[in-house]
Curated annotation (Swiss-Prot):
Protein name listed in UniProt: Isopentenyl-diphosphate delta-isomerase
UniProt key word Isomerase: yes
Gene name in the database record: fni
Gene Ontology biological process: isoprenoid biosynthetic process
Places the protein is found: Cytoplasm
Binding site for FMN: S61, S62, M63, T64, S92, N120, K189, S214, T219, G269, L270, R271, A290, R291
Protein family (similarity comment): Belongs to the IPP isomerase type 2 family.
Enzyme class of the recorded protein, top EC level: isomerase
E.C. numbers: 5.3.3.2
Binding site for Mg(2+): E160
Catalytic reactions of this protein: isopentenyl diphosphate = dimethylallyl diphosphate
Main location: cytoplasm
Native source species: Thermoplasma acidophilum (strain ATCC 25905 / DSM 1728 / JCM 9062 / NBRC 15155 / AMRC-C165)
Lineage: Archaea, Methanobacteriati, Thermoplasmatota, Thermoplasmata, Thermoplasmatales
Record keywords, A-Z: Cytoplasm, Flavoprotein, FMN, Isomerase, Isoprene biosynthesis, Magnesium, Metal-binding, NADP
Length: 348
């Protein structure tokens, strides 16, 4: 059941329009410097993310696992992560807890030397739903399965509200994270709706080490689940998916809200190296890419490598044209921000 759902998610993300109405990264412009006074060849793109050295401030965000087609996708993504010295997460690992026979769709990434690996479990699975919550032993199993450096706890309650089989209880999630944070390095990850400052503060107080914002600008899982509901002719869930298609906090605003609290992965709608530079300029430590890499990871590994290479090149060009010789300096680059994003920033 879970594997079938994950395969449906992959196919919908590859073949349907599941983007939010507006990409808020387009509301940001970085100040151009006609004379950068920088040697392009000396630009340093490396960053330290909570003690892990990345050659480039990019993380392949959690996407998939638990379905047979996911094994090849994760293998290709891991090869790319090793080659470019970037981080990588896998999709929700609940499927491996339920069915150990598909654990290789996740552990395949151990064939490559990925400098930063992120395991993944859903916040809804941390508390009792119609089934028992996952145990600490279950969490240790998935963490060890990929030799993880961090555990992403993904918050997908909008998706759960649209999903025909969705979970409805969030009471107790913070307490469970407090319990787990003593044993695991936790990253709180949204899945398309972003984090408010209020929620981020509660998560940091509970022991979360970093936040991946994944806000409005990119894939919306309300849309993904809308297409699943349409296939099943579930009119109620289709209606909810349409109504909440664009629900949430813009990705750049969520970065701005959270970046003085903890290291932030700016994700949700990043398309290229310039978007990545904007994420860093808004306060992120690194940027997360997902859907823009998915199809190539599935069907064309060579194009996947080329795509990441171009993202890297675009990012270096953005550093050069803003007069910055390293990633840290980019955080202080002057920005011009217009509405509708500007209004969201004022809501902090």
């Amino acid at each position: 059941m879970i594997g079938k759902r994950k395969e449906e998610h992959i196919r919908i993300a590859e073949n349907e329009d599941v983007s939010s109405f507006h990409n808020f990264w387009d509301d940001i412009s970085l100040m151009h410097e006609a004379d950068p006074e920088v040697n392009y060849d000396e630009i340093d793109t490396s960053v330290d993310f909570l003690g892990k050295k990345l050659k480039f401030p990019m993380i392949i965000s959690s996407m998939t696992g638990g379905a047979e087609i996911a094994k090849n996708i994760n293998r290709n993504l891991a090869v790319a992560a090793e080659r470019f010295g970037i981080g990588m997460g896998v999709g929700s690992m609940r499927a491996a807890i339920v069915d150990r026979s598909i654990e290789d769709t996740y552990s395949v990434i151990n064939e490559s030397h990925v400098p930063l690996k992120i395991a993944n479990i859903g916040a809804p699975q941390l508390v009792r739903q119609d089934k028992d919550a996952v145990s600490n032993r279950d969490i240790a199993y998935i963490y060890d399965l990929i030799k993880a450096d961090f555990l992403a706890v993904h918050f997908n309650f909008l998706q759960e509200m649209v999903q025909p089989e969705g979970d409805r209880n969030s009471k107790g999630v913070i307490d469970r994270i407090k319990d787990l944070s003593g044993s695991f390095n936790i990253i709180a990850k949204e899945t398309g709706s972003g984090f408010s400052r209020r929620t981020a503060e509660r998560l940091i107080d509970a022991g979360v080490k970093a936040i991946e914002v994944s806000g409005v600008s990119g894939t919306t899982f309300a849309a993904v689940e809308y297409y699943r509901a349409r296939k099943e002719n579930n009119l109620e869930k289709m209606r909810i998916g349409e109504t909440f298609w664009n629900w949430g906090i813009p990705s750049p605003a969520s970065v701005y809200y959270c970046s003085d609290l903890a290291p932030v992965i700016g994700s949700g709608g990043l398309r290229n190296g310039l978007d990545l530079a904007k994420a860093i300029a808004m306060g992120a430590t690194a940027g997360g890419f997902a859907r823009s890499l998915l199809k190539d990871a599935d069907t064309d590994p060579e194009m996947l490598m080329k795509n990441i290479e171009l993202i890297q090149r675009e990012f270096r060009v953005a550093l050069f044209l803003t007069g910055n010789k390293n990633v840290y300096e980019l955080k202080f680059t002057k920005k011009v921000i217009v509405d509708p994003l500007r209004s969201w920033l004022e809501a902090k």
